[in-house]
């Protein structure tokens, strides 16, 4: 079925910033998609087009991206009469029309909005659930429910506290199914709230952009200690492991790292990549840390390679790879990490997201699907993670509706699959392994 009409508009994300929403019409109805936006963005990401008109929304308006859809992309898609099931053809057409390496003409936010809406329409056109359509596009015969990685303590660029490292996550790998993983996550979260309240006072339980708590602590180890205590109090020590997103590019300073980067600058406290690696190794030794994302700066390739070779855990590339095939290929060759973080808006289309995922999986890497800190109520990534069988997703704490929207959609998918539902569990790094 071909596209009858495409209409884009400015809506608001969970931080009150404008973002792009796209309505796509076929004879089967209306399909709507909204685009997320990140706070700590890698310098190699596809370009998110903002208006930069300081008199409006602090320069963060997206009226230009919206206009590119309504005036240029929409007429082209309608006139070409392409079937909405032809995801790759449609994405390719938009990328060719844009003609730039990083989608800077139309904006990745424009192309992605249309791409997501096309994918939703394609599923209905085929008469299958979205996750099944995505699995078909990726060439997967089965679908898998992921382990959720709940970001329950926020630091870094996501929070106003002194904590340098951005995310402290709990992964309920010992759960029997996704519903139980949600219950464990929620119970640990509520226990954590009480632990923080008792230790630091009620105002320390205010939440950050992704629904996690942001107590004003400086020591990253203290974040891990709080998690360990909460997991124990909830009674899940044997079922929950810990993941971190350090987002080290945010505190990289001339070849070294500043673990107190939110205070006035003082080069005497900077530490070397080796010292930082030793700190991570002490975390791995003392706590059930099984995954660390962006442990070093996006261009500190040597430090990545050294750490991945010796750490023995999942090392996730986000700012390092930005889901870009060239960066992934380099990271594969240099053995810089062993897991890809997949954010659809880093690369800017469904087709390229699928390709990045397949490239990583083909090289024996894990893949973690991810939200952005500026989110909407759109639930596309819930279906994406199931269809791509990556086995792991991070989409915030079990708090704030834009985060729960994704987790609740995963609950619905598990229910719909019934006895056919498979949960990644402890095999979250390679859920398709026989």
Curated annotation (Swiss-Prot):
Residues with the N6-succinyllysine modification: 60, 89, 228, 420
Residues at the catalytic site: 210, 343
GO biological process terms, semicolon-separated: canonical glycolysis
Signal peptide limits: none
Region (Required for interaction with PLG): 405-434
UniProt GO MF annotations: magnesium ion binding; phosphopyruvate hydratase activity
Ranges in a coiled coil: none
SUPFAM superfamilies with a match to the protein in the record: Enolase C-terminal domain-like, Enolase N-terminal domain-like
Reaction(s) catalysed by this chain's protein: (2R)-2-phosphoglycerate = phosphoenolpyruvate + H2O
Cross-referenced PROSITE patterns: ENOLASE
Modifications made to the protein after synthesis: ISGylated. Lysine 2-hydroxyisobutyrylation (Khib) by p300/EP300 activates the phosphopyruvate hydratase activity.
Residues annotated for substrate binding in this entry: 158, 167, 293, 318, 370-373, 394
Keywords: Acetylation, Cell membrane, Cytoplasm, Glycolysis, Hydroxylation, Isopeptide bond, Lyase, Magnesium, Membrane, Metal-binding, Phosphoprotein, Ubl conjugation
Modified residues (Phosphoserine): 27, 254, 263, 272, 291
Enzyme class: lyase
Residue list for modification N6-(2-hydroxyisobutyryl)lysine: 228, 281
Subcellular location as annotated: Cytoplasm; Cell membrane
Residues involved in Mg(2+) 2 binding: 245, 293, 318
Enzyme nomenclature, EC number: 4.2.1.11
Cross-link (Glycyl lysine isopeptide (Lys-Gly) (interchain with G-Cter in SUMO2)): 202
Modified residues (N6-acetyllysine): 5, 60, 64, 71, 89, 92, 126, 193, 199, 202, 228, 233, 256, 281, 285, 335, 343, 406, 420
Family named by the database record: Belongs to the enolase family.
Function comment: Glycolytic enzyme the catalyzes the conversion of 2-phosphoglycerate to phosphoenolpyruvate. In addition to glycolysis, involved in various processes such as growth control, hypoxia tolerance and allergic responses. May also function in the intravascular and pericellular fibrinolytic system due to its ability to serve as a receptor and activator of plasminogen on the cell surface of several cell-types such as leukocytes and neurons. Stimulates immunoglobulin production.
Name this polypeptide is given: Alpha-enolase
Gene of this entry: ENO1
